[in-house]
Swiss-Prot record:
The accessory proteins ExbB and ExbD seem to form a complex with TonB. NCBIfam families: exbB2. The gene is exbB. Belongs to the ExbB/TolQ family. One of its GO terms (biological process) is protein import. The keyword Oxidoreductase does not apply. InterPro entries: ExbB/TolQ_transport, MotA_ExbB_proton_chnl, TonB_ExbB_2. The chain crosses the membrane at residues 13-33, 67-87, 101-121. This is Biopolymer transport protein ExbB. Involved in the TonB-dependent energy-dependent transport of various receptor-bound substrates. Protects ExbD from proteolytic degradation and functionally stabilizes TonB. Keywords: Cell inner membrane, Cell membrane, Membrane, Protein transport, Transmembrane, Transmembrane helix, Transport.
């Protein structure tokens, strides 16, 4: 019988959330390193036009923006699904002691914590890279006047 089951959700919610956040953190690190290398090697004299420079300077910053703005929501989704599993288990078992419930809730919150752990460094990197992009663009403008 293929369909939605709470047992399947219980088995795969952490795997799914951690996989998505793991891929997001890998991509964020990859693009941060790529931008740092590009910014360190960019030759402003090779550009004739500020628009072409700005296109190259802001390349891949949108990906970082998407990651830092969505990682907390992915974590929150994992937490909500984890809490759903806890409530389901409570309903099926006819009741649980407070200790078991608290352990389950604390484990469900790890998804939100991981989402924030991905989002916060990505936000810091994004803002730093955006500032560096603005500085390089301004240096180009000064150089051309």
């Amino acid at each position: 019988m293929g369909g939605f089951s709470m047992a399947m959700l219980k088995d795969y919610v952490d795997v799914f959330v951690f996989a998505v956040l793991g891929v997001a953190s890998f991509l964020a690190l990859w693009f941060v390193i790529e931008r740092v290398i590009f910014y360190s090697k960019v030759d402003l004299k090779a550009y004739d036009d500020i628009d072409a420079l700005n296109l190259d300077l802001t390349k891949n910053l949108t990906i970082l923006y998407v990651i830092f703005s969505n990682a907390p929501y992915v974590g929150l989704l994992g937490t909500v699904l984890g809490i759903m599993v806890i409530f389901y288990d409570m309903g099926v078992s006819g009741g649980m002691d407070a200790k078991t419930i608290m352990v389950g809730l604390s484990l469900a919150l790890k998804a939100t914590a991981l989402g924030l752990a991905v989002a916060i460094p990505t936000l810091i990197a994004y803002n730093s890279l955006l500032r560096k992009s603005d500085v390089l663009s301004e240096k180009f403008r000064i150089m051309k006047t």
